[in-house]
Amino acid sequence: MTDQEIIALWEAGQQERAFNEIVRNYSERLYWHVRRFVCSHEDTDDLLQEIFSKIWAALPSFRGEAQLFAWLYRIATNETLNYLRKQKVRASLRFQSLDAAMERRIDEDPYFNGTEAQRLLTKAIARLPEKQRIVFSLRYYEEMKYEDIAAITGTSVGALKASYHIAYEKLKAEFQDLV
């Protein structure tokens, strides 16, 4: 079902069916979007429940000014960033680096089934600053256009291109050291 059909269902009073279609169409994509930042299967599942709860609560205010997928990704991204900020505060209270904790989670994650190179890339991306990590993940993994990322993040296309380039150069430099 297309996003336009989902919106039409919602507007026709079939809110529950429309929401179920959103969950069906976007669960996996949003899961992997969140997982790239959270690095834990269990935390991602918990966060996804919160995200879909926020989506359900916010759907009546969706005005169609943005594409549905961009609106959903924006909610998911904002909730994920809020979660990471809370984790960072908790980590600082425990005198431990959030980056180090995320790297440890990647190493210990029983659900990670990638190669060693993928594990190293995931860890390197986790060390990028928040904005660069978001832009790189959406562009590289989700293969989104800069215009769509701009709609999700509320950032200009030029700034996104610069962030992506800087992230790419940092990752390239890190992997050149390994070769």
Please identify what each model-predicted range represents.
Residues V135-R139:
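A short pre-motif secondary-structure segment
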